[in-house]
Swiss-Prot record:
Record's protein name: Rho GTPase-activating protein 5
GO MF annotations, alphabetized: GTPase activator activity; GTPase activity; SH2 domain binding
Matching InterPro entries: FF_domain, FF_domain_sf, P-loop_NTPase, pG1, Rho-GAP_domain, Rho_GTPase_activation_prot, RhoGAP-FF1, RhoGAP_dom
Pro residues: bias regions: 1036-1045
Residues bearing the modification Phosphoserine: 590, 765, 951, 968, 1115, 1173, 1176, 1195, 1202, 1218
Function: GTPase-activating protein for Rho family members.
Gene that this sequence comes from: ARHGAP5
Lineage: Eukaryota, Metazoa, Chordata, Craniata, Vertebrata
Length: 1502
């Protein structure tokens, strides 16, 4: 039972491998491969296969347990699976013969039989014999696997006879074959199966193999298997075949030829190798080790398979090769990277062609090593070559190994670098040459495409040399330059036309009429036309300029950081801070004065005499003054001394003042000259700020002869010099004194010095003063234009270099304070320096006592801005004009500068202002005395200016003004009184081109600052809260929709009828004090949000017209209408005139400077005339009583109420003046009308209206013939509009009658200008807008669609009574149309006919359509008064064309309709056309066709 339950054991076979063995003499120097065959079969893995097995053993090894004193080896057993799935165990025995390593004879064994007999033994026995693995096992059995031969004995079942078929081993094959033959005979006796294994077939000799096969063929059932233990070919086949012969149940053995078996085995190896190499390829780091990688891969089947087939050694070799490849690849990449970096390094170290053009490679290397940046580009390694150092692993170090430069590659890169520099130099030269070529081509305009220019430069040498990309790049750069220049010139042009923009106050919005006026004026300028191809950019610049004009801020100033406001704030912040620091040091040095240091300056011993006199009045150099004792240190200085200046610059002596004594004109001149030297040197070389602020006192010495005639002259000249130097003057007291100097003189002079020092201490005292720093007797505004070609410190240096300059109140960053002696007192003057755009808000809103207007004589725009600003300044405010240029020579050498300087002087002469020139290259610009006369003039007019401001403020009590000044109550602090002198304030002469260097602004003088006031009055009128910035720099209100105002009545002078008319208008719209909204009738208010949207088919109400400007509700300038001219004794300042009641009371109303200057007035007037030059009185629509509103705001610039030519008729009542030019014009018109022939009146005059467009177009406004072709006789724009209307809006109510949005109409035409393939549907515009754009197209044509020449014939044909005859006559006339006009006219009339067919829905009958379209198609002459009686006939002609469209153009039948000439009104009162039919007035024109009649202007304003 137990035996049955046991699993059957697999059959076991013992196979003995035999073959040639013995000594070297017998078998040669190598065996036949028996051991390799056994090794490969038992342990087939490559790592377990040992190719060397020796048979020469020591006695010890031979006696070991492995050999066990036997001449056979036990190789162990192996379980083999057959193809049938049957397992069997095979024990392998190798019969060999071991040789003693000492005697080289076979070892003695228990079996003494020869090898042939031993090998044929079928029973083997050896107790405890161990399995053999390899030669290294002998003696180290414990280190290897120990497996005993089963039971110490085995029975051999078959034999495997090995025959070596390879060449070599010092063995004859025939001897081997004989040995094999004998052995086979012995084996045959055992009756065991035998198979021949031909070994070493990988080195096979074919002849040997054939002999073996021949040997086997002679034997019965003897098989030959070709094997190779090295490549593991057919090894297993040998044993399998033998087992099959032993096991009869198995199939007959199948022997595979060696080549086939070899291919199969190699295929396995190749496949395994590929898979293994793919595994190895996953390793990308060449630093990886085999140990790490093999541990990761050991469980991978592909790895295991390759190890089994090829072994670990080959696997490691494969891995090492891969790692080496990775490293070499890394080095190659680094080398490429270095080589690619070399050009950049060369560009850095050797950028100049001149340096290296003639250097060889070695010289260039030495030059590079000397460069400072060498270490940044290259690294010198201690070990070379670089690719064998660790530098290759420093990925972050991009520096190039210097030894790399020794390669040929690096030298080649250097040569290429030199050639590149040469070619680049040539390319740059050619590009610049091409650039100059482009600059010479005058017709290249900004925005012109390259394709239009390319054909003109094809033959240019430079163009041929450079590439197309370079050509485009150079042209692009040239375009950018000329575009930028054109834009700058365009911007400059806009500033030059400042009068065109600055005639409206801030925060207003320009209307469409104003925009048309601007375009009309500017379109004549070449700089405007220069940007014709960049119309959108030009429009953007214009809108940006307009936006800045009406909403100016320093942040949006067009000059950017060069804005005058920004520059002034920066300069004052730094300069005044330095002044304060200097004075602070002076304060600390001068507190608690007990000792007074004085210089005494004189000539011919006068200084010493005065010093002696003072010492005479002193006791031990101590002087008693006003109850206090002062120690005096006197330093007399003779003006003639050569060491004069060196005596002043001593660190030990710090003077508190200087007494300047004189007794003659000569000595006084010396004093003036040397005081100038002292101040100039102290200011220029900045040796001592103390000396720059030194107070001077002029002292007149008494004459020995008291009746000297020179004394009055000396007194007068001394006072003049004192005023100029802004210092006290001590006169000789009345009476007769025997000595030159009087005690009262010395005391007065000492008091002056002490008070000057005390004043300086008050100015810089760190202790808060009780007096408000903002107190000022005069407030002066200095205006300068942003971007003028001079620095701000140039025009501020007269003030900043003055000893009397100080900072204004905190928060006023653009103001400073001056203390100056004006007249008899020291006055405090606040100077506010602003840009012109910031000054505009000040001009109207703030109390300003005077303006200093600075302009550059090199820049027309600067003068234009000055004119625009000055025109609106009240003529009661004194003005000082300052022209700035480099030197006086500019006047003679530059005509433009001469013209601008002459114009400035001329304007100053006309308005009785002061003018001077400032030369930046002259030191005289640092003088301050040039403004003394201006300040005196301002002081004289101060009360009048403030009263005018007060009255204006009272009239505008509801107006909230903003102040850049921060006024506060003021008190009177008397300082010094001086003798009166009529000529004290004599100023330098005005600018004269033939005089010496004009002294506008002086050298620095004493900086003592005084706190004096003239009036001591308070100004509650204009006090405002403290603010850091004027609010106008921050408020930008949104656009306000326009509100019409009451129009002015057309009168010629202020007569009683005018007064009644105005009073009647005021009665309807009484002024309310609490209202800030301009007066208007309710029905005149525009409900549309779009201020520019007119209605082109409805007449404006009679008596009203389009506004040129639209003023928002909160504008600072509102239109004021007085309730009565008689009762209102305090008239409106803005009217610019005094009414008769005011005049009778002796009060002169202030006007504007533009009415005092013919130059200023003519400039503004010329703009208006240029804009409206194409519209005479006769060209206006005569039946319309509407009158164009003046350009000027409200009544402030009402030409009826403003002085025009004050140089002719005075300014108090300018209305009585007449314009001789207009009177002559009217007389000529009357004479011309009397002589006019009646026939000429009947002739039709071409009416060419101004275009409604404000942009350049190459389509709209072109002749019709230029827009069509024979293939496309209809203009594309007309087709698109008609198709859009018929597809989307044929049933729109009021089509062609209701006006579309003008902005949309303009956009449609602009978009079409840019792209003729536009899709109107995608633009999302209304049908009415497209209809309006279509009408505008025909209105802009140079000639009407219905030719003027056929108008009389159409008129005559329309009068024919018989309908049929009338229609045929009209048809014949239509055939006379030009073919182009005929095609388009037919297309349009057909379209209108389709519209009229939907009249029940769109309410547009043929009659209504004709009313809307006939003025557009016929362009009538409205100036012909006889035309008014025929307007209905013209309309009926167009109506007939629409109704009888089929008859006229398509040979259709006549349609029966009502009376064409005078159709009755429709019976349906609800239709829109009802109010249009009975009108006997001509139908409305499109807006662009209406030219309002310009009424006669008696004052010549327009």
């Amino acid at each position: 039972m137990m035996a049955k339950n046991k699993e059957p054991r697999p059959p076991s076979y013992t196979i003995s491998i035999v073959g040639l063995s013995g000594t070297e003499k017998d078998k040669g120097n190598c065996g036949v491969g028996k051991s390799c065959l056994c090794n490969r079969f038992v342990r087939s893995k490559a790592d377990e296969y040992y190719p060397e097995h020796t048979s020469v053993l020591s006695t010890i090894d031979f006696g070991g347990r492995v050999v066990n004193n036997d001449h056979f080896l036990y190789w162990g057993d192996i379980i083999q699976n057959s193809e049938d799935g049957v397992e069997c165990k095979i024990h392998v025995i190798e019969q060999t013969e071991f040789i003693d390593d000492q005697t080289f004879l076979p070892h003695r064994s228990t079996n003494l039989q020869p090898y042939i007999k031993r090998a044929a033994a079928s029973k083997l026995q050896s107790a405890e014999k161990l399995m053999y693995i390899c030669t290294d096992q002998l003696g180290l059995e414990q280190d290897f696997e120990q497996k005993q031969m089963p039971e110490g004995k085995l029975n051999v079942d078959g034999f495997l006879l090995c025959i070596d078929v390879s060449q070599g081993c010092n063995r004859k094959f025939d001897d081997q074959l004989k040995f094999v033959n004998n052995l086979f005979v012995q084996l045959s006796k055992s009756k065991k199966p035998v198979i021949i294994a031909a070994t070493k077939c990988d080195e096979c000799v074919d002849h040997y193999l054939r002999e073996v096969q021949a040997f086997a063929s002679n034997k019965k059932n003897l098989l030959v298997v070709e094997t190779s233990a090295r490549f593991n070919v057919n090894i297993e086949t040998c044993f399998t075949a033998l087992v099959q012969m032993l096991d009869k149940t198995r199939s007959k053995p199948k022997i595979i030829p060696y080549l086939d078996a070899y291919k199969t085995q190699r295929q396995l190896v190749v496949t395994a190798t590929d898979k293994f190499e793919k595994l190895v390829q996953t390793v990308r780091d060449y630093h990886a080790t085999w140990k790490t990688v093999s541990n990761k891969l050991k469980n991978h089947p592909d790895y295991e398979e390759y190890i089994n087939l090829e072994g670990t050694r080959k696997a490691r070799n494969t891995f090492s090769k891969h790692i080496e490849q990775l490293k070499q690849e890394h080095i190659r990449k680094r080398r490429e990277e270095y080589i690619n970096t070399l050009p950049r390094a060369f560009n850095t170290l050797l950028p100049n062609l001149e340096e290296i053009e003639h250097l060889n490679w070695s010289e260039a290397l030495k030059l590079m090593e000397k460069r400072a940046d060498f270490q940044l580009c290259f690294v010198v390694l201690e070990k070379t070559p670089w690719d064998e150092t660790d530098h290759i692993d420093k990925i972050n170090d991009r520096r190039i190994p210097f030894d790399l430069l020794s390669t040929l590659e690096a030298e080649k890169v250097y040569q290429n670098h030199v050639q590149h520099l040469i070619s680049e130099k040539r390319r740059v030269e050619m590009k610049e040459k091409f650039k100059k070529t482009l600059e010479k081509i005058q017709f290249i305009s900004p925005g012109q495409p390259w394709e239009e220019v390319m054909c003109f430069v094809m033959e240019d040498e430079a163009y041929k040399y450079i590439t197309e990309a370079d050509s485009k790049e150079v042209y692009g750069r040239h375009q950018r330059e000329i575009v930028e220049k054109a834009k700058e010139e365009f911007q400059e042009m806009l500033f030059e036309h400042s009068e065109l923009f600055y005639d409206l106050d801030l925060n207003a919005t320009p209307s469409s009429d104003k925009m048309s006026e601007i375009h009309t004026v500017l379109s004549e300028e070449p700089r405007y036309k220069a940007l014709q191809k960049l119309a959108p950019d030009r429009e953007s610049l214009l809108l940006k300029h307009i936006g800045f004009v009406y909403h100016p801020t320093k942040e949006t100033c067009l000059s950017g950081q060069n804005c005058t406001d920004i520059k002034v704030e920066q300069l004052l912040a730094s300069s005044l801070l330095q002044l304060d620091h200097g004075r602070l040091r002076l304060y600390h040095d001068s507190t608690n004065i007990d000792k007074v240091n004085l210089f005494i300056l004189g000539k011919d011993g006068l200084a010493q005499e005065l010093a002696n006199e003072i010492r005479t009045q002193s006791t031990d150099d101590e002087y008693a003054l006003d109850g206090k004792i002062y120690e005096l240190d006197l330093r007399p200085v003779d003006a003639k001394s050569p060491y004069f200046l060196s005596q002043l610059w001593t660190a030990a002596f710090k003077p508190h003042g200087c007494f300047c004594v004189f007794n003659s004109i000569e000595s006084l001149s010396f004093i003036g000259e040397f005081i100038g030297k002292i101040r100039t040197e102290a200011s220029q070389i900045r040796k001592d700020k103390y000396m720059a602020n030194l107070p001077f006192t002029l002292i007149l010495a008494n004459q020995r002869d008291s009746i000297s005639k020179n004394l009055p002259i000396l007194r007068h000249q001394g006072q003049q010099l004192a005023n100029k130097l802004q210092c006290p003057f001590v006169d000789v007291p009345a009476g007769t004194y025997p000595r030159k100097f009087n005690e009262t003189q010395i005391k007065q002079a000492l008091r002056g010095v002490l008070e000057s020092v005390k004043h300086n201490l008050d100015v810089v005292s760190p202790i808060p003063a009780n007096k408000d720093l903002s107190e000022a007797d005069l407030r002066i505004v200095m205006c300068a234009m942003c971007g003028d070609p001079f620095s701000v410190d140039l025009i501020l240096s007269p003030f900043l270099d003055s000893h009397s300059c100080s900072a204004a109140q905190a928060g006023q960053n653009n103001s400073l304070m001056l203390d100056k002696i004006i007249g008899e007192k020291r006055r405090r003057i606040q100077i506010t320096i602003l840009s012109y755009h910031s000054s505009i808000g000040v001009r109207k809103d703030e109390l300003v006592h005077g303006y200093i207007l600075v302009y550059s004589a090199k820049r027309k725009a600067s003068m234009g801005m000055l004119r625009a600003f000055l025109s609106e300044v009240q003529d009661t405010i004194p003005v000082q004009l300052v022209a700035v240029t480099d030197s006086q020579a500019d006047f003679f050498e530059n005509e433009a500068i001469k013209e601008l300087m002459t114009e400035g002087e001329h304007i100053a002469t006309e308005i009785t202002a002061k003018f001077t020139a400032l030369y930046s290259l002259s030191q005289y610009h640092r003088q301050t005395e040039v403004f003394t006369l201006f300040f005196s003039d301002v002081l004289e007019k101060k009360n009048m200016i403030e009263n005018s401001y007060l009255s204006d403020n009272t009239r505008e009590s509801t107006h909230q003004s903003e102040d850049v000044f921060l006024p506060s109550p003021r008190d009177c602090f008397p300082y010094n009184n001086y003798p009166d002198s009529d000529d004290d304030t004599e100023a330098p002469p005005p600018y004269s081109p033939i005089g010496d260097d004009v002294q506008l602004l002086p050298t620095p003088s004493d900086r003592s600052r005084y706190r004096l006031d003239l009036e001591g009055n308070e100004y509650p009128i204009h006090s405002t809260p403290n603010c850091h910035d004027h609010e106008r720099n921050h408020k930008v209100p949104p656009p306000i929709k326009p509100k019409p105002v009451v129009p002015k009545t057309n009168v010629k002078k202020l007569d009683p009828n005018l007064l009644k008319t105005i009073e009647a208008g005021i009665g309807k719209n009484p002024r309310k004090q609490t209202s800030r909204v301009p007066l208007a009738h309710p029905e005149d208010m525009d409900p549309s949000d779009n201020y520019a949207e007119p209605i082109d088919t409805i007449f404006k109400q009679k008596g009203y017209s389009d506004e040129i400007y639209v003023v928002p509700d909160d504008s600072q300038n509102r239109i004021k209408i007085r309730n009565s001219f008689v009762n209102n004794t305090q008239g409106d300042e803005e009217n610019g005139f005094s009414d008769r009641t005011s005049k009778s009371h002796g009060e002169r109303r202030p006007s504007k400077y533009k009415y005092k200057s013919k130059t200023l007035f003519s400039k503004a007037k010329s703009y208006y005339r240029r804009t409206h030059s194409d519209a005479s009185d006769d060209e206006a629509f005569t039946t319309s009583k509407t009158k164009r509103k003046g350009r000027h705001r409200g009544s402030e610039e009402d030409p009826l109420l403003s002085p025009v030519e004050t140089w002719k008729g005075g300014i108090d009542n300018p209305a009585i003046t007449s314009d001789q030019e207009l009177d002559d014009k009217k007389m000529k018109k009357k004479t011309h009308k009397v002589k006019e022939d009646k026939k000429q009146k009947k002739k039709t005059k071409n009416f060419n209206p101004p275009t409604r467009r404000n942009w350049e177009s190459n389509y709209f406004g072109m002749p019709l013939q230029d827009l069509v072709t024979a293939e496309k006789p209809i203009p594309l724009f007309v087709e698109k509009c008609v198709e859009f209307i018929e597809d989307t809006g044929l049933c729109t109510e009021g089509l062609y009658r209701v006006s579309g949005n003008k902005t949309d109409q303009d956009n449609i035409q602009k978009q079409f200008d840019q792209d003729h393939n536009i899709n109107l549907v995608s633009m999302e515009v209304t049908v009415n807008a497209v209809a309006g754009a279509l009408k505008a197209f025909f209105a802009d044509l140079p000639d009407p669609l219905i030719p003027y020449s056929l108008h009389p014939e159409l008129l005559e044909a329309a009068k024919i009574p018989d309908k049929t005859e009338r229609l045929h006559a009209l048809k014949e006339i239509v055939k006379k149309f030009h073919p182009v006009n005929y095609d388009v006219f037919r297309y349009v009339i057909t379209h209108l006919n389709r519209v009229s067919q939907q009249h029940k829905i769109n309410l547009m009958t043929a009659d209504n359509l004709s009313i809307c379209f006939w003025p557009t198609l016929m362009r009538p002459d409205f100036e012909n008064r006889e035309f008014l009686s025929t307007t209905k006939i013209h309309q009926s002609v167009v109506e007939t064309f629409i109704q009888q469209c089929q008859f006229f153009f398509y040979n259709g039948e006549i349609v029966e309709t009502t009376n064409i000439v005078a159709p009755p009104p429709p019976s349906n009162p609800g239709q829109l056309v009802e109010p249009m039919v009975p009108l006997q007035l001509p139908p409305p024109l499109q807006p662009q066709l209406i030219q309002p009649q310009l009424q006669t202007d008696p004052l010549g304003i327009i």
